């Protein structure tokens, strides 16, 4: 694989995270949570292709489906909370919990494609560690960009941003659930 092909692969793998994080960024998210989530996704996108390389196809399919459904359910819940807040004009949006478990679940939900890619990398002459590093860096930057874009859109749209963000999360959840 050429460097250009590796970069395109990394961008393709980072698009789920970018889309999700635009929606999450429209909620109330602190700077340290933005950094923590971006780093979590970066690490997942390094580790998952490596795990995929070693894990095997059967295990990947099983974990992929389970993680996809869990990730979809989490996104439905978050999307519902954001839409409800945007419609009802409650004073404070219930805060998404960015504790260790929350970060790990969000990171897992957007990195399952990277696990699948790891399976296929074993059939191609490529430096797995280099590809995993590039994939992680690109996904981390795309996560950060999505969160920051979501924050900016939220400032422009005000409370309506909660509805838009919630709808984005619901669309992504539907894609996750019905694609798998």
Swiss-Prot record:
Name which cysteines form disulfide bonds: none
Q: Where are the transmembrane segments?
A: 6-26, 34-54, 63-83, 100-120, 128-148, 158-178
Is RNA-binding among the key words of this record? Answer: no
Q: What keywords does the record list, in alphabetical order? A: Cell membrane, Ion transport, Manganese, Membrane, Transmembrane, Transmembrane helix, Transport
Cellular component, GO annotation: plasma membrane
Q: Indicate how the chain sits in the lipid bilayer.
A: Multi-pass membrane protein
> Subcellular location, in the record's words?
Cell membrane
Classify the main location. membrane
Q: Does the keyword tRNA processing apply?
A: no
List, in alphabetical order, the Gene Ontology terms for molecular function in this entry: manganese ion transmembrane transporter activity
Role according to the record: Probably functions as a manganese efflux pump.
Entry's family note: Belongs to the MntP (TC 9.B.29) family.
Known PANTHER family for this protein? Answer: MANGANESE EFFLUX PUMP MNTP-RELATED (PTHR35529:SF1)
Protein name per its UniProtKB record: Putative manganese efflux pump MntP
State the organism of origin: Carboxydothermus hydrogenoformans (strain ATCC BAA-161 / DSM 6008 / Z-2901)
- List the gene name: mntP
């Amino acid at each position: 694989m050429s460097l250009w092909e590796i970069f395109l692969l990394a961008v393709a793998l980072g698009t789920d995270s970018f889309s999700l994080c635009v929606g999450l960024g429209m909620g109330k998210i602190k700077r340290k949570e933005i950094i923590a989530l971006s780093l979590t996704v970066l690490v997942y996108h390094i580790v998952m292709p490596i795990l995929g390389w070693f894990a095997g196809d059967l295990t990947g399919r099983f974990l992929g489906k389970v993680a996809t459904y869990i990730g979809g359910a989490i996104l439905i819940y978050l999307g519902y909370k954001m839409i409800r807040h945007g419609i009802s004009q409650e004073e404070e949006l219930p805060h998404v919990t960015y504790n260790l478990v929350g970060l790990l679940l969000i990171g897992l939900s957007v990195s399952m494609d990277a696990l699948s890619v790891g399976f296929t990398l074993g059939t191609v002459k490529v430096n797995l560690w280099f590809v995993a590093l590039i994939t992680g860096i690109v996904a981390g930057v795309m996560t950060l960009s999505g969160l920051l874009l979501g924050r900016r859109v939220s400032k422009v749209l005000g409370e309506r941003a909660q509805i838009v963000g919630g709808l984005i999360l619901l669309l992504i959840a539907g894609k996750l659930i019905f694609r798998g």
